[in-house]
Swiss-Prot record:
Hexadecanoate binds at T39, S73. This is DegV domain-containing protein Cgl2349/cg2579. Keywords: Lipid-binding. SUPFAM superfamilies: DAK1/DegV-like. Monomer. Residues 3-259 form the DegV domain. It holds the Pfam family DegV.
Length: 274
């Protein structure tokens, strides 16, 4: 049996894609307290049970686990604890430093290799390589939810509210940072297209556009990206997972991209030699 690939629901993988590639998706937790909602990561017990089930299916080939950034959730540390239960490194946990379809794309790449008979190490390597070539941006229609979750400071939230700005966030080293501040959705989308176009550097791109209660806006952004990016680029539409939607709020639109090459700041001699 091939290597088994596991993600949590923050990867935003569409159900049909996960089923086609035989990727196991474990749901993160959303808790409702009246009008307030919060999220929690997976426990080591939950993860160990899931890994054990997949090891039974895959035999000696092992399990590759990709989870939300350790900077954003306790899930990664729980995964490392759960993996240590099993002998001989049969469960490998990828330190993704990301979320959304950047993680989803890495899982897809690993699962395709697994279907072709690749080893656990080979699946791990392609997942890491895919993540190094990826970027994730998210346009926030409003900042209330992300401020409440502690992902941005009170000062930043106050300035954004006072100036009526709609930020574009970027994931860097597993943490969220502001990539750009815009006044309107149309300007934000133009900026997102510019960021993706510059980073693509004339090479085809894999793009996954996520949305939370913003389906028409996501379609508009996809059309802009299709017109701007090189021929041969591929596109996928996904829903932002409910656990991420708690923090991004309604109207959020995300862009996860996998590029042909690593960004200059991520390039190393080892990567270039592969």
């Amino acid at each position: 049996m091939p290597v088994r690939v596991i993600v949590d629901s923050s990867a935003c993988l569409p159900t049909h894609v996960a089923e086609d590639l035989d990727i196991t998706v474990i749901n993160l937790h959303v808790m409702n307290n009246g009008e307030e909602r919060s999220t929690s990561g997976l426990s080591s017990l939950e993860l160990a049970a899931s890994y054990a089930r997949q090891l039974e299916r895959g035999g000696d080939d092992g399990v590759l686990a990709l989870h939300i950034s350790k900077e954003l959730s306790s899930t990664w540390s729980a995964a490392v604890t759960a993996a240590a239960v099993f002998d001989d490194d049969s469960v490998r946990v990828v330190d993704t430093s990301s979320l959304g379809m950047a993680v989803g794309a890495a899982a897809m790449a690993a699962a395709r290799m697994a279907k072709d008979g690749a080893s656990l190490q080979e699946c791990y390597d392609i997942a890491v390589d895919t993540l190094k070539r990826s970027e994730t941006w998210i346009y926030l229609h409003r900042i209330d939810e992300i401020w409440k979750s502690g992902r941005i400071s009170t000062a930043t939230a106050m300035v954004s509210t006072a100036l009526a700005t709609r930020p574009i966030m970027r994931f860097n080293g597993g943490r969220m940072e502001i990539a750009a501040k815009t006044r309107t959705q149309s300007k934000a989308f133009a900026k997102l297209v510019e960021l993706a176009q510059i980073r693509a550097d004339g090479e085809p791109v894999f793009i996954a556009i996520g949305q939370n209660e913003a389906r028409e806006a996501a379609k508009q952004l996809e059309e802009l990206l299709r017109n701007a990016l090189p021929e041969g680029s591929s596109f996928m539409s996904v829903d932002i997972d409910p656990t991420l939607a708690v923090h991004s709020g309604p109207g959020a639109v995300s862009v996860s991209a996998v590029f042909a090459n690593q960004a200059p700041e991520l390039s190393t001699g080892k990567a270039g030699a592969k």
